[in-house]
Amino acid sequence: FSGSVNQACSGFGWK
C-alpha cells in the first residue's frame, strides 16, 4: 500500500 491508503493499511495491520 502507499499514498492515501497508507492510513488504511496501518489500521488493517498491512504494510
UniProtKB/Swiss-Prot annotation:
GO cellular component: extracellular region
Residues of the signal peptide: none
Location within or outside the cell: Secreted, Cell wall
Top-level taxonomic group: Eukaryota
Keywords noted in UniProt: Antimicrobial, Cell wall, Plant defense, Secreted
GO biological process: defense response
Keyword Secreted: yes
Coiled coil regions in record: none
Keyword Translocase: no
Protein's UniProt name: Antimicrobial peptide 1
Organism: Pinus halepensis
